[in-house]
Amino acid sequence: MSRIPVKMSAVLLTGHGGFERLRYREDVDVPSAAAGKVLIKVLAAGVNNTDINTRTAWYSKSVTGETSTGGAEGFETADDDDGSWSGTPLAFPRIQGADCCGEIVAVGEGVDDNRIGERVLVRTMQQAAVDYQPFKCWTVGSECDGGFAQYMLAYSAEAFKVESDWSDIELASIPCAYSTAENLLERANVTSGETVFITGASGGVGSAAVQLAKRRGAVVIAQTSKEKVAEVRSIGATQVVTREQKLTDTVGTESVDVVIDLVAGNAFPDLLELLKTGGRYAASGAIAGPIVELDVRTLYLKDLTLIGCTFQEQKVFENLIGYIERNEIKPLVAKSYPLKDIVQAQQDFLAKKYVGKLVLVPPQH
């Protein structure tokens, strides 16, 4: 095993704002493995909406627009005091990166030395840091440093060994997007034979949700742009509709059991109309805007259940590792980039001209 260096390359987020807040450095201190933690050599790290949303402080209630509108330059109205997952100010500089596939190279006190050499995925929505309290989480790349570096620290309990012939880049596409998607389906209690409508189906979470819903035996109706219809159908959607089509006409009112929504915005009222009486709506994103119009009569007269999904039960990530190892899901990587090209990767992410995930690769020396 190679010697652990003193310094490493990393991308530092120096504050909320635009791309200018991302600084690629080659002189960042390599962290030491503290008690209960492991030092991981990062082999690859995926790009996610949350990385951009955290950078721009989109999570602040002072921001009401689409995620993409401030993706390049940030939001002038953003309040730094509540711009994180936890609703508390971030500590800067912060190393972002919600996804990490890596190799354990050192362990802290109380961690078995035999873990050294394991290839692992780091759980994005961590629980060890908050003592496994329900509905509390510690997000990688937000409340603690993440994978946009050559090395990162993680609680040993949050670094899940994975045995698979997938590449590092393919594995790095999994933690944030697939756990978010699996959690949405789990919280909505999607079962075999049910019809599920998925918005934003070409993105990382949406494409994962299509696969994972299909794995559960659901009938999947997916929404995407007209350019991506064939690709979304190829990963398991039974029916694909485009954003230009009127949902209530194309899909039909009272026609689906569950809506998995990553988009929100102006389409929200129509999504509720698609649901059968007693249907479930689960959300974990609002890329088209967080402020929606709700006719409360639709909610109560149809006996709908609205579910917000952030916190994940322990079994969600454990199940994902099993799906990978049994080849029950497949990775969907559109492109990879050197870590130093993070701005280009995020520009391509915001352009949304691909299906699946974009992945960054740190220097491997």
What are these regions (language model features)?
Residues 195-198, 214-270:
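Adenosine-nucleotide cofactor-binding segment
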Residues 136-137, 143, 224, 266-332, ...:
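Glycine-rich phosphate-binding loop and adjacent beta-alpha segment
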Residues 202, 210:
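N-terminal Rossmann NAD(P)H-binding glycine-rich loop of SDR-like oxidoreductase domains
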Residues 207:
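Residues forming the Rossmann-fold NAD(P)(H) cofactor-binding site
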